[in-house]
Amino acid sequence: MKQLYRKLIPLLIVFFTQFSFAHTTSDKSDLYDQCVDHTLQKLKLDKINNTIVQSCSNETKAVYKKQIITVLDKIRQESQQESQPDRYLNILKSQRLWKSYVDKECDNAGTFIGSPMYSYCPMQEYRKRVDQLREYVDL
């Protein structure tokens, strides 16, 4: 058990140090950061905690999920206009595979890094996916 703690503690310190640094240096226009800042002010707290991470991650992920749906709809429309139904179907297949990957990868992150990752990891992956899908359309 001691050996596990000796390996786990440095990993957690590195994770939370990087997480804290990323939070303080990131773009303030980021939805997640805005949520965290607003919640800290609203609750009159000085530091972020796991509940705030979970709440803001879930809230931000919901926004990205809507954006993904919007972009997928745009891809569907473009595919119809260009008579390329396979294009849309292939992207839907990759979307399902991507979702399975995110679910498993973020479950691993939560298990091995810590519980905040169960919500923070999917939010990050959804943001990346929005950017990735936008490359496929003329927005």
Give each language-model segment a name:
Residues F21-L139:
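N-terminal alpha-helical modules
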Residues M1-I9:
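Bacterial N-terminal signal peptides that target proteins for export
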Residues F15-F19:
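N-terminal signal peptide c-region/cleavage motif recognized by signal peptidases
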Residues L11-L12, R134:
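Intrinsically disordered, low-complexity segments enriched in polar/charged small residues
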